[in-house]
């Protein structure tokens, strides 16, 4: 077809036209891109900025349905429409805040006519013209944008309206919007209607009005803007729920919906709408906890099973997403619940705060000032808590109810579930033929296969036992037997934490190897087929620890899979304990009682060779094969016999059955004691015919032996205060009787060899080290000497050197405390047929009180503090004299703090602190067992650097300690020091701890556990037993001396008759000779006869006969009954010489005299002799210790000057003002409360230390000094009250604090230790520390002069002119001793007037020098105004020689010490003295009644002549002496 010539022209025209249009569009787009809209247009164009989305959304919401009520379901609604309705509704509710008289809101929702109306009878809107805007106020605020009454932020409002948009937005999104309001105040009614999205305003109607105010908003939502046809069911259900919200959250307002009143009476009944028909896991209705906290806050709480849920309102706005108001309340509840859950879930899965919150459903209704939200939709309140304008502190009642409403149980169930999930991850649900990752497992070849039920897993005690089992598998084969070694004891899963179980490799390995699954029930045979092994065989040593391992494995299976025990799933493999052989005969015994029975029924048992098997490692591979070849004899099955088996297993391992366990063990001990008395053999399990065992029998006959031995190892004996390990050490040292020091490591080897010690040598070395320690807080009397670094108070003994480098030997006091003469009266034990240590030693004083004791066994624990040696000795003397013993306070050697009694068996221990100036304090003593380094790290460092929770308190501290003394100089600001003083420096700096002695449990002399209520009960028990044993000793000595005397008499007569020729022995037959001797009336060897009569194997020590004698005995004793005259016929010829004859006669006469002397003595006399010898040696030892301490101190050895300043820095400052620790009423009340309240776990756990107790003010304390209540006790080193004292506060049964009482009492009949003159100083106190780990300390007491703090009463006089300090007065010849004083005497002493000669007398300390059993008058200083004091005294004793003077440090006798301070309430303190007249007078007046402080020199006696003679001298007062106390640390193992 041809193309018309016009065609191209048209096409070109069209192209040009298109180009022009595109260019026009480009020009227009600039204007379109950058447009300006009015606010009304903007709201309609972008509604989501103002009212939220105008699109339909579907989500889960709380709605109200007619047939169901409030429920949580999926709804489809338009958020924008919901919001405009809500704005009008909240405005109506806000009106209640403006007008409290408002009482009604009427809501009408008419879906058919698309009409919503909200009416309230609150105060109407002012119907008045706005002078600025020139229009009526209702028209202004409903028809003009950006208008509001809420723009004044200075005004605190609790309304929902905030930004001035709400009602206008409703107007804009409505086709018709009518406001009608009436104001009685302005007497007008206003009505106006807007149409077309607020685009067109109708005529305003104004009418006169005289009725009640009201406001009514009626609107027709513009459904087209929300893409809706009508108000559907879902949006109506949501709006109805909001009407209910308003009814619940607005107080005292009735809400009507469509003419019907809503059945809601306040917030609590509103909450019920949500929880109606809701039940917890057990089917019970949910408990609701409600509290009206105040007029602005109302809270309800219940349990939630769907995570954290909250329904909350802020000023009637439903904050569906919560906000800070919800967090504020929820966090308070969570914090309390977390604590409760942690307590109840000890050891379970760790629970965090958000996990606790997930179990809570909280309802909050709050009025908050000027709240802020994160959007105009107001779903999340963002205002900070500090701006709320009110607080919501939930009451204790609410919290208590919250704990009991089911939330805690729900959390704990969730914890168990989570734990189970975690545990199940450790198990395999599928049976595997091969297991990887357990290298030490020798798997049975058939394990995990078809025949797995026939397989047995042998669990052995350690690798060596595995080797034995593997040797035996050569006999039975490897197809059906697997072997896995256990590393020691497995966990007690019944009491273990979830974390422990999860991380315990041993348990996880057993589960993996056997194929066990948690929570699976293995009732039937099919379930057993899912396991890799059908049985577990336990193969442990036949000792008590082996029994414990068996018990723990039984407990493990029983706790998790009790059904397995019914299938005979467990069995044990037993091996012999003893084998006897003769020729080719061999017998094996599987229990010692069975062996003993065999011995008693076999007359010639000594001809058999006996071999003891200590563990599986003793058996050879050959023997292992023999055992496995006779599997029937060695395999013992555990048989389930019923509920009594379950009960027995729980009894042994459940924490809840502590009391039952005590009863169980007590019954066992009583039964064993009765059997011994009746001569019956012990019960045993493994006889020749035993093939099975019930769990009940195993627990009650085998495992109980472990529990009992655990107690024996952990709890010392009342008699000697020692545990078996310590007794073995002492036995070995006595036997070795080393004259030279020996290495600790070597001694440990020796102990293991000589005393048959079967445990690790490391623990033995620690026992030796602990027996030798003598730092403050360890031993008061160390039985071994610490030669080398045995540990110090810096680290609590943990800084001891390696046992390879340190040496020890017996203390010179040891054999005086444990006299060899008593050894014959003791019952020695036998182990492996070897004679080892005795059942107990019998010291001359109760060592359990001197060095304290501590240990935790099964069912019981023991905690006894240290007491002062001299106080104990004095009390023993009182008991011997038939008098009542004096009360004692704990005392630790060389401790300078105080120990005060709070209540019976409860004490408070305080360190020492002094104020140097307004910004500096000095800490010169820490509570007992608060170690210097620990204190620095845990108290001072956090105070210096601050922690996350606490700001720094101090600005700096300096350290001036030595290994024996403490000195921290602490700097802080004036304000903080003043505040700390107000609170109490001891409390702030944690210088007070508490000591409770409520678990004084010890083995008595018959081996039964006994709980003592007081220390004096222990003392009386010991006294009776010891006196009885002195009687036994006398009896034995009389027999022995009689026999020796007869022997010497016979020998002397024989020699004399031979010389006279009356007897001829030359060339005569032996038989004839014996006949002649009998005829002439000679006795058969009297000593030998006497020993045989004792029916004792002669002790190795006493049987030191020469080899010749032994040989002679052998040849002589043809018949046991024949007479023995070797003692005569074996005498050497040179006995016939004159010299030897005379010597023999002299010996005979001396022995006879010795015998006569002994006969005249009573057991008490023997005891007193021992005590006197011991005290004398104690003085010498302490003098030497003091001398050693003084080496290098200024003033010693003539080279003092260079070191003087350097040494002074370690001593307490002389100008410090001592802070007296206070015991507050609260502390006493707390102590009383503890007494009334039985401590639940009295037997297993220690009560916490009470640190930081508040103390009384200094002033009150000083006033009290003069006049104390008679009932209270306080420990002072200078005095010891003698009146009856209140019992002291309980200390935690397991707590360790021990303190050693300062000792020389005025009642003491023991020569006091030497004491040096002191510098004016304040009283120092004894502090007891709470956790000493060991039971012994034998440190000798040392006196220290360097550590006293001057008394706060006269700091300015702390140093007087040094003129006379260096002059050493002659040793005083005599010292009065004070004895038998009543506490009341203290009150009678009136201080002398300042003018009295005594007052001018330079510090002279009266030393009380007691002498046993004698009361002598004390010479008192004749001060003019001094009242008479009771005078009692003792023999005077000369000062020890060689004491050196120390001008600066009052080190010696030569200085005149100040008199002790007056006795106050019973308190253990180091003695101190003041130069000030007043204090001096007080001391003088008190001197007689007060006990002499520990360490006080025997040579300082206040004597009239001396006092007068020296008063002219103004000697410089000495620095106070510090007493370092030691506490025992022995049972770390």
From Swiss-Prot:
The record marks 804 as: Transition state stabilizer. It is found in: Cytoplasm; Nucleus, Nucleoplasm; Nucleus; Nucleus, Nucleolus. Residues 342-344, 990-999 are annotated as: Interaction with DNA. The active site is at residue 805. The modification Phosphoserine is found at residues 4, 1106, 1213, 1247, 1295, 1297, 1299, 1302, 1332, 1337, 1351, 1354, 1374, 1377, 1393, 1395, 1451, 1471, 1473, 1476, 1478, 1497, 1527. Residues 455-572 form the Toprim domain. The modification Phosphothreonine is found at residues 282, 1205, 1244, 1327, 1343, 1472. Residues 1-22, 1090-1121, 1183-1215, 1231-1533 are annotated as: Disordered. GO terms for cellular component: centriole; chromosome, centromeric region; condensed chromosome; cytoplasm; DNA topoisomerase type II (double strand cut, ATP-hydrolyzing) complex; male germ cell nucleus; nuclear chromosome; nucleolus. Residues 715-1171 form the Topo IIA-type catalytic domain. Residues 7-16 have a biased composition (Polar residues). SUPFAM superfamilies: ATPase domain of HSP90 chaperone/DNA topoisomerase II/histidine kinase, Ribosomal protein S5 domain 2-like, Type II DNA topoisomerase. ATP binds at residues 91, 120, 148-150, 161-168, 376-378. Residues 1256-1272, 1360-1371, 1443-1455, 1493-1504 have a biased composition (Basic and acidic residues). It comes from the Eukaryota. Keywords: Acetylation, ATP-binding, Biological rhythms, Cytoplasm, DNA-binding, Isomerase, Isopeptide bond, Magnesium, Metal-binding, Nucleotide-binding, Nucleus, Phosphoprotein, Topoisomerase, Ubl conjugation. Binds two Mg(2+) per subunit. The magnesium ions form salt bridges with both the protein and the DNA. Can also accept other divalent metal cations, such as Mn(2+) or Ca(2+). The modification N6-acetyllysine is found at residues 1424, 1444. Residues 1099-1108 have a biased composition (Acidic residues). Mg(2+) 2 binds at residues 541, 543. Homodimer. Interacts with COPS5. Interacts with RECQL5; this stimulates DNA decatenation. Interacts with SETMAR; stimulates the topoisomerase activity. Interacts with DHX9; this interaction occurs in a E2 enzyme UBE2I- and RNA-dependent manner, negatively regulates DHX9-mediated double-stranded DNA and RNA duplex helicase activity and stimulates TOP2A-mediated supercoiled DNA relaxation activity. Interacts with HNRNPU (via C-terminus); this interaction protects the topoisomerase TOP2A from degradation and positively regulates the relaxation of supercoiled DNA in a RNA-dependent manner. This is DNA topoisomerase 2-alpha. It comes from Sus scrofa (Pig). The gene is TOP2A.
């Amino acid at each position: 077809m041809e193309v018309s010539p016009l065609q191209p022209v048209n096409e070109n025209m069209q192209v040009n036209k298109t180009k022009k249009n595109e260019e026009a569009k480009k020009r227009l787009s600039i204007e379109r891109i950058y447009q300006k809209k009015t606010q009304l247009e903007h709201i309609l164009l972008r509604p989501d900025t103002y009212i939220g989305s105008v699109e339909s959304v579907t989500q889960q919401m709380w709605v109200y349905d007619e047939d169901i009520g409030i429920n949580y379901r999926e709804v489809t609604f338009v958020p924008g429409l919901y919001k405009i309705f809500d704005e009008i509704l909240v405005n109506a509710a806000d009106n209640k805040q403006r007008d409290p008289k408002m009482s009604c809101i009427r809501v009408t929702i008419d879906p058919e006519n698309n009409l919503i109306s909200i009416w309230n009878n609150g105060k109407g809107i002012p119907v008045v013209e706005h002078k600025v805007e020139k229009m009526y106020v209702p028209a202004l605020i409903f028809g003009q944008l950006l208008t509001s009454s809420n723009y004044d932020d200075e005004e605190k409002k609790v309304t929902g309206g905030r930004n001035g948009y709400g009602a206008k937005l409703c107007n804009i999104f409505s086709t018709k919007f009518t406001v009608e309001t009436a104001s009685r105040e302005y007497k007008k009614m206003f009505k106006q209607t807007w149409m077309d999205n607020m685009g067109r305003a109708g005529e305003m109607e104004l009418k006169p009005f005289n009725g009640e105010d009201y406001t009514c908003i009626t609107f027709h939502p513009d459904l087209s803007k929300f893409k809706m046809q009508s108000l559907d069911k879902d949006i109506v259900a949501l709006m109805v729920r909001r009407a209910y919200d308003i009814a619940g959250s607005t107080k005292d307002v009735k809400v009507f919906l469509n003419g019907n009143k809503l059945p809601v009476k306040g917030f609590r009944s509103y909450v019920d709408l949500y929880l109606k028909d809701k039940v917890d896991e057990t089917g019970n209705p949910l408990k609701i906890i409600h509290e009206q906290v105040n007029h602005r806050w109302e809270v309800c709480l219940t349990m939630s099973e769907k995570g954290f849920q909250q329904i909350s309102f802020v000023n009637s706005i439903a904050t569906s997403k919560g906000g800070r108001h919800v967090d504020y309340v929820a966090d308070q509840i969570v914090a309390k619940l977390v604590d409760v859950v942690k307590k109840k879930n000890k050891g379970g899965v760790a629970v965090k705060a958000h996990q606790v919150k997930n179990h809570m459903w909280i309802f909050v209704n709050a009025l908050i000032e000027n709240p802020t939200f994160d959007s105009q939709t107001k779903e999340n309140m963002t205002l900070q808590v500090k701006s709320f304008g009110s607080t919501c502190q939930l009451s204790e009642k609410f919290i208590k109810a919250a704990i009991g409403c089911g939330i805690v149980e729900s959390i704990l169930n969730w914890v168990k579930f989570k734990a189970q999930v975690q545990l199940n991850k450790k198990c395999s649900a599928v049976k595997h033929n091969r297991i990887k990752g357990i290298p030490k497992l020798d798997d049975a070849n058939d394990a995990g296969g078809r025949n797995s039920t026939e397989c047995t897993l042998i669990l052995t005690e350690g690798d060596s036992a595995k080797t034995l089992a593997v040797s035996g598998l050569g006999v039975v084969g490897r197809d059906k037997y697997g072997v896995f070694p256990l590393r020691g004891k497995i966990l007690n899963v019944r009491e273990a934490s979830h974390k422990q179980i999860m991380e315990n490799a041993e348990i996880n390995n057993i589960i993996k190897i056997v194929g066990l699954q948690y929570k699976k029930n293995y009732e039937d045979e099919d379930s057993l087929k899912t396991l890799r092994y059908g049985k577990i065989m336990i193969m442990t040593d036949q000792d008590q620890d082996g029994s414990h391992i068996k018990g723990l494995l039984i407990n493990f299976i029983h706790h998790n899979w009790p059904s397995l025990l019914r299938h005979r799933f467990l069995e044990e493999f037993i091996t012999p304990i003893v084998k006897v052989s003769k020729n080719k005969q061999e017998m094996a015994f599987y229990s010692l009682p069975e062996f003993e029975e065999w011995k008693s029924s076999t007359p010639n048992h000594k001809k058999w060779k006996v071999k003891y098997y200590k563990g599986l490692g003793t058996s050879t591979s050959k023997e292992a094969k023999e055992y496995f070849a006779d599997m029937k004899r060695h395999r013992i099955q555990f048989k389930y016999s019923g509920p009594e088996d379950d009960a027995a297993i729980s009894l042994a391992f459940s924490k809840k059955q502590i009391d039952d366990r005590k009863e169980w063990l007590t019954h066992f001990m009583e039964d064993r004691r009765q059997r011994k008395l009746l001569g019956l053999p012990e019960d045993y399990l493994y006889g020749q015919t035993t093939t099975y065992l019930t769990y009940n029998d195993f627990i009650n006959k085998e495992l109980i032996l472990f529990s009992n031995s655990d107690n024996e190892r952990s709890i010392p004996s009342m008699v000697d205060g020692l545990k078996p390990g310590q007794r073995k050490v002492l036995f070995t040292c006595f036997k070795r009787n080393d004259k030279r020091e020996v290495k600790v490591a070597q001694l440990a080897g020796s102990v293991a060899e000589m005393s048959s010690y079967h445990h690790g040598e490391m623990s033995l070395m620690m026992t030796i080290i602990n027996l030798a320690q003598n730092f403050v807080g360890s031993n008061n009397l160390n039985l071994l000497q610490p030669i080398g670094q045995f540990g110090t108070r810096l680290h609590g003994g943990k800084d001891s050197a390696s046992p390879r480098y340190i040496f020890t030997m017996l203390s010179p006091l040891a054999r005086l405390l444990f006299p060899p003469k008593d050894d014959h009266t003791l019952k020695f034990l036998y182990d492996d047929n070897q004679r080892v240590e005795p059942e107990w030693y019998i010291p001359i004083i109760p060592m359990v009180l001197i060095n304290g004791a501590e240990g935790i066994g099964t069912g019981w624990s023991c905690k006894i503090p240290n007491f002062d040696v001299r106080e104990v000795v004095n009390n023993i003397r009182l008991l011997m004299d038939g008098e009542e013993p004096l009360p004692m306070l704990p005392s630790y050697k060389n401790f300078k703090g105080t120990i005060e009694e709070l209540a019976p068996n409860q004490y408070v221990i305080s360190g020492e602190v002094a104020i140097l100036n307004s910004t500096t304090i000095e800490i010169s003593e820490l509570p007992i067992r608060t170690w210097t380094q620990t204190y620095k790290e845990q108290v001072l460092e956090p105070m210096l650097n601050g922690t996350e929770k606490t700001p720094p308190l101090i600005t700096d501290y300096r350290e001036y300690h030595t290994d024996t003394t403490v000195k921290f100089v602490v700097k802080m600001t004036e304000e903080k020091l003043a505040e700390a003083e107000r609170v109490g420096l001891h409390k702030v700096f944690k210088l007070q701890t508490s000591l409770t002695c409520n678990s004084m449990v010890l083995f008595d002399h018959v081996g039964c556990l006994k709980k003592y209520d007081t220390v004096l009960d222990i003392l009386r028990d010991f006294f009776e037993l010891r006196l009885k044993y002195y009687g036994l000793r006398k009896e034995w000595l009389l027999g022995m001396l009689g026999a020796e005397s007869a022997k010497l008499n016979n020998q002397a007569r024989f020699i004399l008759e031979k010389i006279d020729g009356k007897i001829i022995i030359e060339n005569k037959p032996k038989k004839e000779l014996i006949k002649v001797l009998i005829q002439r009336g000679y006795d058969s060897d009297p000593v030998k006869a006497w020993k045989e009569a004792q029916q004792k194997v002669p002790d190795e020590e006493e049987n030191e006969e020469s080899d010749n004698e032994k040989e002679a005995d052998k040849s002589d004793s043809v018949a046991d009954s024949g007479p023995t005259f070797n003692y005569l016929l074996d005498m050497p010829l040179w006995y016939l010489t004159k010299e030897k004859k005379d010597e023999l006669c002299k010996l005979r006469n001396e022995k006879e005299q010795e015998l006569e002397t002994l006969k005249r003595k009573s057991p008490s006399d023997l005891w007193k002799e021992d005590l006197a010898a011991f005290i004398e040696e104690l003085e010498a030892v302490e003098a030497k210790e003091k001398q050693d301490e003084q080496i290098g101190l200024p003033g010693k050895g003539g080279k003092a000057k260079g070191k003087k300043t350097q040494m002074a820095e370690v001593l307490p400052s002389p100008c410090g003002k001592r802070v007296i620790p206070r015991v507050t009423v609260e502390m006493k009340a707390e102590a009383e409360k503890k007494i009334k309240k039985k401590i639940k776990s009295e037997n297993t756990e220690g009560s916490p230390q009470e640190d930081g107790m508040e103390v009384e003010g200094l002033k009150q304390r000083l006033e009290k000094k003069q006049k104390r209540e008679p009932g209270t006790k306080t420990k002072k080193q200078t005095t010891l009250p003698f009146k009856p004292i209140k019992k002291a506060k309980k200390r935690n049964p397991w707590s360790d604090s021990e303190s050693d009482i300062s000792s020389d009492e005025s009642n003491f009949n023991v020569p006091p230790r030497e004491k040096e003159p002191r510098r004016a100083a304040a009283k120092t106190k004894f502090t007891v520390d709470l956790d000493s780990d060991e039971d012994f300390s034998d440190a000798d007491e040392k006196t220290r002069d360097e550590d006293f703090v001057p008394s706060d009463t006269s700091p300015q006089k702390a140093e007087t002119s040094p003129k006379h300090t260096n002059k050493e007065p002659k040793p005083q010849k005599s010292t009065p001793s004070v004895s038998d004083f009543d506490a009341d005497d203290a009150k009678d002493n009136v201080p002398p007037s300042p003018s009295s000669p005594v007052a001018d007398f330079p510090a002279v300390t009266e030393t009380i020098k007691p002498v046993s059993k004698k009361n002598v008058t004390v010479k008192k200083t004749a001060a003019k105004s001094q009242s008479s004091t009771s005078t009692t005294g003792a023999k005077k004793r000369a000062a020890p020689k060689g004491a050196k003077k120390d001008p600066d440090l009052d080190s010696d006798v030569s200085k005149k010490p100040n008199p002790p301070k007056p006795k106050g309430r019973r308190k253990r303190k180091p003695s101190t003295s003041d130069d000030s007249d007043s204090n001096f007078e007080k001391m003088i007046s008190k001197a007689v009644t007060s006990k002499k402080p520990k360490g006080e020199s025997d040579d300082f006696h206040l004597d009239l002549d001396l006092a007068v003679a020296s008063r002219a001298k103004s000697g410089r007062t000495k620095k106070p002496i510090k007493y370092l106390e030691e506490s025992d640390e022995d049972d770390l193992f």
